[in-house]
């Protein structure tokens, strides 16, 4: 399933009267407001993919935008980004054939670990920075980076992390200024909530939020009332609460401060962040913080709340059932793959189906983290230098 550049949409959108003549649908991985994602085996090769099935009636009036954005996604090729492999069209459906992920979700892996350190978090963030830097060089802004969109490539202990879900991604330039309020509450940058024009810096803010969560297990901004939550984000005031941050290095906190900087012009870029000692040096500590972080993840990101349309563990379950286990990683054909098109709103195209933040009822994209704020505070940061 080669992806080539310079093609018209008609040449890369393959016609299929009956998709099931090409793929054998194995199992439903998830459903959303506009689509269904299924585990599918390509009959000609035996390769496994995740196929997102979108009824054309859901696309009505949005065809042009969707085609433009799919064309953008087809240009992306990076080892830490889930790939769009192919596109089929039938009289009634559009089918997006995605790389299939088999390693499960980020939070699951952290909770299941017996040992987890700052160094582990630093390694994760380094991979995210590398992938997002690639996107930014391509002129693409993801706009919905969050832990739920970070998946493991395989079951392997040293598996790389993959960025998924480009439902809200957007190309910079071409004369248009990004100003649509979209993303997931709790991870969006202040300038997005302020409805100001914004840039790729919004992704860097989100990476800072993710790094924060990876080091303590709860989000930097929390309130059961969305308006108050947005107020906190707009002010960029967050805390390094005791006792949760007592064993975290000053270098890690400095790294987060530079990404969660209120002023996007002063905020670290991906390139700057990748050069920070916490990423590029030896300042990330090797002390085991698993007990504290995993306990907070269990408390604040309950599976039933933060898992949305795509259930990555269904892939693992199905593979085990088919006894594909060890052959997956060694096979050059079948499943060296990964997926997730599951965004909170199951968005289909960046410019057409952005979820307006003001209408969201969830907190931080996980339904609601019902975490009481710790009463002892070791440090408060205003998000502005």
Curated annotation (Swiss-Prot):
InterPro entries: Kinase-like_dom_sf (IPR011009), Prot_kinase_dom (IPR000719), Protein_kinase_ATP_BS (IPR017441), Ser/Thr_kinase_AS (IPR008271). ATP binds at residues 29-37, 52. Transmembrane segments: none annotated. GO terms for biological process: inflammatory response; negative regulation of apoptotic process; nervous system development; positive regulation of apoptotic process; positive regulation of CREB transcription factor activity; positive regulation of neuron projection development; positive regulation of neutrophil chemotaxis; positive regulation of phagocytosis. Induction: Expression increases upon treatment of EC cells with DMSO and retinoic acid. Induced by KCL in PC12 cells. Residues 279-319 are annotated as: Autoinhibitory domain. It is found in: Cytoplasm; Nucleus. Residues 23-279 form the Protein kinase domain. This is Calcium/calmodulin-dependent protein kinase type 1D. It comes from Homo sapiens (Human).
